[in-house]
Amino acid sequence: MLKRNKRFLLMFLTLALPFGCVGCSDGGSASYDQISGAEAKALMDSESGYIILDAREQYEYDEGHIPGAILIPYDKIADCAEKELPDKDQLILVYCRSGRRSKIAAEELVKLGYTNVKEFGGIIDWEYEIVK
């Protein structure tokens, strides 16, 4: 009986151990950085080769947007990002109106493998130039 229990325990530990190790790992999950509008503006002034991504709807973009911003509505990121943003290591600065949709867009970009995503909230707090 004791030999049988040892065998059962050994088999259980052999099967359970890999699951225990995998379950505790975060898998090296990536994330995006949340920065202020002033920090985003400083990056725009000092960096080159970045993308400004407006995550709002077309009518909102038409009413006014940050100069040079491209429009990809937050709910279209999964469908359009790979075509519009081919370099997954490029600096991508994401905004929307208030910050809610830009967070969703930034999360989706990270899920798609983008590695240099910065979310800076909404245009309602943007204190710099806007074009129509």
Task: Indicate residue ranges for each PLM-predicted region.
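Structural scaffold elements adjacent to functional motifs in cytosolic proteins
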Residues: 52-54
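Rhodanese-like catalytic fold shared by cysteine-dependent sulfurtransferases
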Residues: 2-10, 19-38, 43, 50, ...
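Hydrophobic helical h-region of N-terminal Sec-dependent signal peptides
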Residues: 13-14
